[in-house]
């Protein structure tokens, strides 16, 4: 019946009965037959796979689903569109995938860093480094690890650390520390940390409370530092860290103003109830809802460390989102209001002005000033509006457009920014500052005397900011309105009489109270009636003059000004952040035209063309600095003497330049006589003139003497024979006197006569030919010989010991070279070169001084009564009570009494806001250490930038060698016992001790740090009696001694230090002082030596100097021909010290020649050069260099400089020899005449 075969196995699913089918069904596609058991196993595998990977979502279809997602958000409105794409979500995704280095840092930190828990909250961290666990001392709590929590920790309060040894099982899995900290970027939990100028910094806002104890790692995962805290420094945060030095000793580096970064919650107080400062108890306790209570809460926590958190919580506790960069910085000033204060010059005289000027700060560069007024900017009565300013129009608050505001000095100022009570403007120079505005037909202005100057940056006195130039550090007022750590003191306003609250109602004085306000009244008619009312009140007085009404305003703060009366009773103070605080920035300064430089022999001529007054400073780089300092404002030419020790000049804002003189000269010391004279005349003009005059005088005297002797001798000889007829003239006399003899005895007869009569003259007669022969030989020798060579004595630098000792000059860049010889081994070349040297004294900070600011609180006015002063702990605090002030009715305080009124005036000193960027530090300096960075090469080993201590005791490990250098031959330092550091400059200055500063001089304001409470001040502050018309606190005091010192401080040490020292800071040090010599000792390992049998043996050496310029930087070239036993390398060195060879070794073949360069100061160098174990002598003549002045120091010593060349000596000897011949001839003739005359007489 069914066309299909019967199944031999039970089916997997029941088969439904099938309907009638065509006996010829359609054909189906062929499929491979699957065995039943295999099918069951496959189905089981699929079921297990589905259970295992059920969480894996199926792959979406390729086409339609993707197309459906795109048009889905299109019909939706714009508002939901913003919600679906919040910017923080994208930033969060980026943070989830840190970089490779940060991932490694986070991995190492998570394994070796353990949180410290306090009350279940992470308060800080402890890390395991080098087998020890380190925990910040200021972080309270317990380490979240059972084994580490059980360790007994030792306290090191000087480093703010606790430490202890970790268990043995954990020592193999700890972080390793390193003392290597090259400048660059390092890693920590929050990303990159920048290390520069010996300080770790991060961008501001990165890291904070709770990060104390986290490690800073390098790229190898080694701990470089442990974070303890930080200090905000403008746009970056300086980290307080603990590091390790090269000896493994812990070093703490804490920047000024740093705070510990533990997460301990700071508590605030309100009505004897403590609460977290970021969570006020009346949450949401907003200023809008409870203004008076909020101000009271802030006043009671004025000195709290978390005052900023409390202020932010009180101002921003509402959930309404605020616009970033606008209300974020403006909302806190809604706690304050403008006020009316006294102005000494309102254009028409003294008045109570709505825009009175409280203070002007102009210590920034480029003409920026900050003005504080009694009006407010960027605020209206109903909120924030940058286009408006508000002021007190009588007793009401009024707002107008900010465009009606102006400021001027000698010309209108440019308003840069404004916020709260403050204006930031850029003004031209002037002697007064005026601020005003136009309110309809009314004009309000206030002018005060304040000198505004354009303060240029650097060493050029330009008058306008340049368009381009050089970037230099300067002080500016930041344009930001954000919190910068400076505060302005506020308080609730005092009571001021308001006549508008009083009126007559049925012959009685009625007090009208505004809605929602309170009024305090005081009446005397004749009984005293006083009280406070929140509603209208009618008194028994019948005259308005008998009552005073005061509107109580406790919902707003005002500035704590000396021009406003203080409230009655105990008043608390508040504070708000000051905008536009001074910060360190970069300013563009002018760059004077480069001087035209002219070089002559040992002379430097500068042709200067300044565009404005420009400072020129110079100094010599030797023992006597001979510093000069002059302001050049007109084109001029200056001439300076330059020696081989070096000369430095600094022109304007250009970097300093150093030059050195070379032994140059015109002519040729080895040429003809006129060339020799020209050469020495250019180098030694006076000596050459004296020498030439002496030679000329000798020649003239010799010639005259010889001629006179010869003439006199001839006359003496001939005269007797002329007088005697038929006299016989001897043959010799006839020959000498050109006389033709008629008859003469022969020679034998004459000699016989002398022998018998006078034997002395016989021997004299015999010696005459010998003398003539000697004179002829001497003249011949002077004509043909070049003169004797110079004898140069120098010490050998070779050493024959395993431990090599020597002495090298303390000059940076001048290498010390030697061949270290050891018996049985080939010589090893040794080279030590100083890269930098540092003289680091022990500096103890005595105090910090800066410009002071006189704080004048609101005075206390007591009507019809007396008040008294109370002592307060403020620097230079002055308090005085003045009686009989503000007479009846019309006085500034509106008192009833005539003479019984009193005022308590107060004033004291505090640091100015500029102290954060403009201060001087007074240090006491003691004997310090000397450090050096050296490059060492011995054999084939080369070591770069090795740090060593120059004390003769501390060895430095240089590979397998051990180097000990020092101490210096001269215990010298450029620092006096007292130095002052101002900015990047250092001054030797005898400052007064702490607590002994005098008014008007350096040290009139002293403190240990910029934030400490040990402030000392002596400013000769004196309070004066107030005038009756207005409420104010007059005073007098001495000008700032710090500002006076800045004007008269003179030249910094960097411009006058001898020996070419460069003064640097952080730490205080003198670098590269070329003073004294440095002994050294180095132990070279055996592996650096090679057996002498393994090195080539050199023979048949011949050295020839092909070209030589003496006193120049490797200006000599010589060629050495050789024969070697085998090919190889040989060190070369000149042990004589006359020449310094540039090359250290040469590669030798079996035979050939090689060329080397050398530097020498000798005109006739004759030095020995050692090649392996063989020695050859190189001789030759050197020419003078063509360049008079160069910008590099000499590479040789000046000890062997020859004063006179051999050629000059030869010409001099020829000259003197020829002159002496004339004298000898004259003497011979005189002797002959005397002999003849004597013989004739006998």
Curated annotation (Swiss-Prot):
<feature type="transmembrane region" description="Helical">
    <location>
        <begin position="689"/>
        <end position="709"/>
    </location>
</feature>
<feature type="site" description="Cleavage; by host signal peptidase">
    <location>
        <begin position="801"/>
        <end position="802"/>
    </location>
</feature>
<feature type="topological domain" description="Extracellular">
    <location>
        <begin position="745"/>
        <end position="759"/>
    </location>
</feature>
<protein>
    <recommendedName>
        <fullName>Structural polyprotein</fullName>
        <ecNumber>3.4.21.90</ecNumber>
    </recommendedName>
</protein>
<feature type="disulfide bond">
    <location>
        <begin position="863"/>
        <end position="895"/>
    </location>
</feature>
<feature type="disulfide bond">
    <location>
        <begin position="1061"/>
        <end position="1073"/>
    </location>
</feature>
<feature type="region of interest" description="Functions as an uncleaved signal peptide for the precursor of protein E3/E2">
    <location>
        <begin position="262"/>
        <end position="273"/>
    </location>
</feature>
<feature type="disulfide bond">
    <location>
        <begin position="850"/>
        <end position="915"/>
    </location>
</feature>
<dbReference type="GO" id="GO:0016020">
    <property type="term" value="C:membrane"/>
</dbReference>
<dbReference type="Pfam" id="PF01563">
    <property type="entry name" value="Alpha_E3_glycop"/>
</dbReference>
<feature type="region of interest" description="E1 fusion peptide loop">
    <location>
        <begin position="885"/>
        <end position="902"/>
    </location>
</feature>
<keyword id="KW-0597">Phosphoprotein</keyword>
<feature type="region of interest" description="Ribosome-binding">
    <location>
        <begin position="98"/>
        <end position="112"/>
    </location>
</feature>
<feature type="region of interest" description="Disordered">
    <location>
        <begin position="1"/>
        <end position="104"/>
    </location>
</feature>
<feature type="region of interest" description="Binding to the viral RNA">
    <location>
        <begin position="83"/>
        <end position="113"/>
    </location>
</feature>
<keyword id="KW-0720">Serine protease</keyword>
<dbReference type="InterPro" id="IPR000930">
    <property type="entry name" value="Peptidase_S3"/>
</dbReference>
<feature type="disulfide bond">
    <location>
        <begin position="869"/>
        <end position="879"/>
    </location>
</feature>
<dbReference type="InterPro" id="IPR000936">
    <property type="entry name" value="Alpha_E2_glycop"/>
</dbReference>
<keyword id="KW-1133">Transmembrane helix</keyword>
<dbReference type="GO" id="GO:0055036">
    <property type="term" value="C:virion membrane"/>
</dbReference>
<keyword id="KW-1191">Eukaryotic host transcription shutoff by virus</keyword>
<keyword id="KW-1144">T=4 icosahedral capsid protein</keyword>
<dbReference type="GO" id="GO:0004252">
    <property type="term" value="F:serine-type endopeptidase activity"/>
</dbReference>
<keyword id="KW-0946">Virion</keyword>
<feature type="region of interest" description="Transient transmembrane before p62-6K protein processing">
    <location>
        <begin position="717"/>
        <end position="737"/>
    </location>
</feature>
<feature type="topological domain" description="Cytoplasmic">
    <location>
        <begin position="710"/>
        <end position="744"/>
    </location>
</feature>
<feature type="transmembrane region" description="Helical">
    <location>
        <begin position="781"/>
        <end position="801"/>
    </location>
</feature>
<feature type="transmembrane region" description="Helical">
    <location>
        <begin position="1219"/>
        <end position="1239"/>
    </location>
</feature>
<dbReference type="InterPro" id="IPR042305">
    <property type="entry name" value="Alphavir_E2_B"/>
</dbReference>
<keyword id="KW-0165">Cleavage on pair of basic residues</keyword>
<dbReference type="InterPro" id="IPR009003">
    <property type="entry name" value="Peptidase_S1_PA"/>
</dbReference>
<feature type="modified residue" description="Phosphothreonine">
    <location>
        <position position="113"/>
    </location>
</feature>
<feature type="site" description="Cleavage; by autolysis">
    <location>
        <begin position="261"/>
        <end position="262"/>
    </location>
</feature>
<dbReference type="Pfam" id="PF01589">
    <property type="entry name" value="Alpha_E1_glycop"/>
</dbReference>
<feature type="disulfide bond">
    <location>
        <begin position="1130"/>
        <end position="1172"/>
    </location>
</feature>
<feature type="region of interest" description="Host transcription inhibition">
    <location>
        <begin position="37"/>
        <end position="70"/>
    </location>
</feature>
<dbReference type="GO" id="GO:0020002">
    <property type="term" value="C:host cell plasma membrane"/>
</dbReference>
<dbReference type="InterPro" id="IPR002533">
    <property type="entry name" value="Alpha_E3_glycop"/>
</dbReference>
<feature type="topological domain" description="Extracellular">
    <location>
        <begin position="325"/>
        <end position="688"/>
    </location>
</feature>
<feature type="glycosylation site" description="N-linked (GlcNAc...) asparagine; by host">
    <location>
        <position position="272"/>
    </location>
</feature>
<dbReference type="GO" id="GO:0046718">
    <property type="term" value="P:symbiont entry into host cell"/>
</dbReference>
